[in-house]
């Protein structure tokens, strides 16, 4: 049994030696039979025509397989585009998808720039460094697009206290008038109508001016009096409590305790009698005495 390269098994009995032939004719007959069987198998398979679509594997590998496949793919893609219509997507040329290996010319750098889209000059998109060049584009010069000119803010004015519009100006008293008013205020803080009329005429002032001056002076005296009282209260409070450094003894308290203790210790008890030690009274005042830092100075 002989194994052929095409996978066809041929028995030796089928291809026996002919009666009048030699041994060299057997291999040639077997090869012819195998070739005929291979041709029949290839004829039985359906033949698939190569696809000429631009995205197919056949079109992509056309350069490596056949030298004329590239031209046929280009022609087929151009015919399909012509039959489909003349509308083409932006930036796509005929045959560019069918032949990706074809070199494409690079587009200029400013093709997709903002200046190319708006069709504006390049100097209009760049801010001028010198004051001679215009700082805004021509279409912004119109009052519709140009912003209003910036206003220079002046420094804020000092806000004064608002007074009434019909407010009378402050009366400028002279030194002699002020001395006379102060002397009269020390004598009497409240003036009667007759006294006020007489006093105002002597100073060449109106009764209203004298009345207002006395009102303001009484308010000032009240403020000064309250401040003096506050100072006295603060001065009356000691810096440290007197119990920290002072000693206070009640009248007769320690003396009575010491006398009782001496009488019990040295009293007449036993063979030897001793006189009790006199204890000087410590309480010299009728009230508590505090010896603090104020009394030691």
From Swiss-Prot:
Low complexity compositional bias, start-end: 25-38, 71-88
Keywords, ordered alphabetically: Developmental protein, DNA-binding, Homeobox, Isopeptide bond, Nucleus, Repressor, Transcription, Transcription regulation, Ubl conjugation
InterPro entries reported in the protein's UniProt record: HD (IPR001356), HD_metazoa (IPR020479), Homeobox_CS (IPR017970), Homeodomain-like_sf (IPR009057), Msh_Homeobox_Regulators (IPR050674)
Disulfide bridges in this chain: none
Chain residue numbers at which the record places covalent cross-link Glycyl lysine isopeptide (Lys-Gly) (interchain with G-Cter in SUMO): 9, 127
Entry-linked PANTHER family: HOMEOBOX PROTEIN MSX, HOMEOBOX PROTEIN MSX-1
Subunit: Interacts with CREBBP/CBP, TBP and SP1; interaction with these transcription activators may inhibit autoinactivation. Interacts (via C-terminus) with PIAS1 (via N-terminus); the interaction is required for the localization of both proteins to the nuclear periphery and specific binding of MSX1 to the core enhancer region in target gene promoters. Interacts with H1-5.
Family: Belongs to the Msh homeobox family.
Matches recorded under Gene3D superfamilies: Homeodomain-like
Origin: domain of life: Eukaryota
Annotated region of DNA binding: 166-225
Listed name of the protein: Homeobox protein MSX-1
Species name: Daubentonia madagascariensis (Aye-aye)
Keyword Nucleotide-binding belongs to the record: no
GO aspect biological process, one term: inner ear development
Subcellular location: Nucleus
Purpose: Acts as a transcriptional repressor. Capable of transcription autoinactivation. Binds to the consensus sequence 5'-C/GTAAT-3' in downstream activin regulatory elements (DARE) in the gene promoter, thereby repressing the transcription of CGA/alpha-GSU and GNRHR. Represses transcription of myoblast differentiation factors. Binds to core enhancer regions in target gene promoters of myoblast differentiation factors with binding specificity facilitated by interaction with PIAS1.
Source organism phylogeny: Eukaryota, Metazoa, Chordata, Craniata, Vertebrata
Region described as Disordered: spans on this chain: 1-50, 66-108, 129-157
A GO molecular-function annotation: transcription cis-regulatory region binding
Post-translational note: Sumoylated by PIAS1, desumoylated by SENP1.
GO terms for cellular component: nuclear periphery
């Amino acid at each position: 049994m002989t194994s052929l390269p095409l996978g066809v098994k041929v028995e030796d009995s089928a291809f026996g030696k002919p009666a009048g032939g030699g041994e060299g004719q057997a291999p040639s007959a077997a090869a012819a039979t195998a070739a005929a069987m291979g041709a029949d198998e290839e004829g039985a398979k359906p033949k698939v025509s190569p696809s000429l679509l631009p995205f197919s594997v056949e079109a992509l590998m056309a350069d490596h397989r056949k030298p004329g496949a590239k031209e046929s793919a280009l022609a087929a893609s151009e015919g399909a585009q012509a039959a489909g219509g003349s509308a083409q997507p932006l930036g796509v040329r005929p045959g560019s998808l069918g032949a990706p290996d074809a070199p494409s010319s690079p587009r200029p750098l400013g093709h997709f720039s903002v200046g190319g889209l708006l069709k504006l000059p390049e100097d209009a998109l760049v801010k001028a460094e010198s004051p001679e060049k215009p700082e805004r584009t021509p279409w912004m010069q119109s009052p519709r697009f140009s912003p209003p000119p910036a206003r220079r803010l002046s420094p804020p004015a000092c806000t004064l206290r608002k007074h009434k519009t019909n407010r009378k100006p402050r009366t400028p008293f002279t030194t002699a008038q002020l001395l006379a008013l102060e002397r009269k205020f020390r004598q009497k803080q409240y003036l009667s109508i007759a006294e006020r009329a007489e006093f105002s005429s002597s100073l060449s002032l109106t009764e209203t001016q004298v009345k207002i001056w006395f009102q303001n002076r009484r308010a000032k005296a009240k403020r000064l009096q309250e401040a003096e009282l506050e100072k006295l209260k603060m001065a009356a409070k000691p810096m440290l409590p007197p119990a920290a450094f002072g000693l206070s003894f009640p009248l007769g308290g320690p003396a009575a305790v010491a006398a009782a203790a001496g009488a019990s210790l040295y009293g007449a008890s036993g063979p030897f009698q001793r006189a009790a030690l006199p204890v000087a009274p410590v309480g010299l005042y009728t009230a508590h005495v505090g010896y603090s830092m104020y009394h030691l100075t």
